[in-house]
Every structure is written in structure tokens, then in C-alpha cells.
Amino acid sequence: MLTTSLTSFGFSSSEALALVSQEKKKYDNPWPYTASTEKIGTKKFATFGPATPLTVTLGAKSGEFRFEPDNLKLTQGKLYALAMDNPSDVPHYFTALDLARSVYTVVVLAGEPPAEFKGQVTDLELKPGAQLVWYFVAMRPGTYDVRCPIKGHEAMAATVTISKPAL
């Protein structure tokens, strides 16, 4: 059908087939950019060095509504790889409005193919069994609240503290 349309615009049949084949190759891989935690975690961003790994679990298999750990300590200017997982049977959010304004998000990898988020990441939803890695640079010192805003999950609270680097 596309080749017929192209021939109506003056392309020969062989030119139309070649053009369609060339365009199809572009779209055979809908995810032309490959990203992996191995590549990003070791990549240097400006002077930040390799990512410092952190892990937070949202919820628990036992049904408890909690963040584990419930207190993260970061240093201003460092690149972090915050791995999150949700082993529970219900969805949970990692919501941190003020933290979103205090970090520079490099990338968020979630699933295959990875999803990339730009700008302020205020909410990250993890469905049951989901995992993701959030790469960011801690920028503004302070203590920031993290919560899961789902009704009934009020007990899920944590803090993230960004401190100035030691001189």
C-alpha cells in the first residue's frame, strides 16, 4: 500500500520498495537506545564519579507497609543508583515532592526496555513484584520526607537526608 502511494508521487516500483525497506529497518527495533545498569552505573557524569548504590524495599511479602531502610543519608554532589523493589502483593509509591526539587535525575530504568524520565521525579509507582533503578545526583542539602500516598498506607514513611560534603 505504501509502495503504491510512493509510485503515485513519481517513484519507480524498485525505488519505492527500497525506500519502504530502508524505513522498515529503522523501526524493526522500537527501542534503538540500549541502556543497562552495568553501563550507566559505571559511567562518569561530569566529576561525580561512579554511582553509589542504594537499595530501598517498598512493602514486604508479609504484608507490612514500610520502607526498608526508612532513612537514607546522601552527600551533596554524588551520583546515586537507588534500586527499588516491591516484593508485596499490592502497589506502592515512592513519593518525595521536596526531594524531587533537590536532586538532578539522570535516568530511571524500569523494566525492559528501560523507561527514561526527565525532569523532576515526584512519584515512582511500583506494582507488585516491580523493580527499578533511579540514577540521580543529590544537589540541595536538607531532610526530605518520603511516603506512600495510597489510602491505608500512611505507615509507609521514610526520610532522605542530603548533607554537604566533608571538606
Which residues does each PLM region occupy?
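N-terminal twin-arginine translocation
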Residues: 5-18
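Extracellular/periplasmic metallocenter environments
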Residues: 15-46, 118-167
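Beta-strand cores of secreted/periplasmic/IMS beta-sandwich domains, seen most often
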Residues: 45, 69-95, 132-139
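N-terminal export leaders
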Residues: 1-3
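Short aromatic-acidic-glycine turn motif
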Residues: 100-111
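Short beta-strand and strand-turn-strand segments in soluble, beta-rich domains
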Residues: 64, 111-119
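Solvent-exposed coil/turn segments that connect beta secondary-structure elements
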Residues: 61, 79, 85-89, 97-101, ...
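N-terminal edge beta-strand
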Residues: 47-79
